[in-house]
Amino acid sequence: MTDESMSYQEKAYALLQADAEKIIQLIRVQMDHLTMPQCPLYEEVLDTQMFGLSREIDFAVRLGLIEAKEGKALLDRLERELSALHEAVTKKRVR
């Protein structure tokens, strides 16, 4: 799909997905290395990224570019990835 044929709604959602994917990559890097998620620097970066994405989503919803349920689905996916990281780290510590 070319830029000309994409609607503003499609562009907005694609940009939000790309930003969410960057956060997921950050989470996956942590999972791959099983670095402690309680690391203050990691927590601050992740919190900042999640907050920024939530504000982007809110803005897109308020403009009518995406549905609130689509934004919630993006954030829910990130929460699941984060839960998986915490579970993996917890399992590693138990061993």
Swiss-Prot record:
Where does the sequence pass through the membrane?
A: none
Q: What is this protein called?
A: UPF0358 protein GTNG_0942
Which family does this protein fall into? Belongs to the UPF0358 family.
For this protein, the record's InterPro entries field holds:
UPF0358, UPF0358_sf
Q: What is the lineage of its organism?
A: Bacteria, Bacillati, Bacillota, Bacilli, Bacillales
Q: Where is the signal peptide?
A: none
Give the organism, scientific name.
Answer: Geobacillus thermodenitrificans (strain NG80-2)
Q: Which cysteines are joined by disulfide bonds?
A: none
* Pfam hit, one: DUF1507
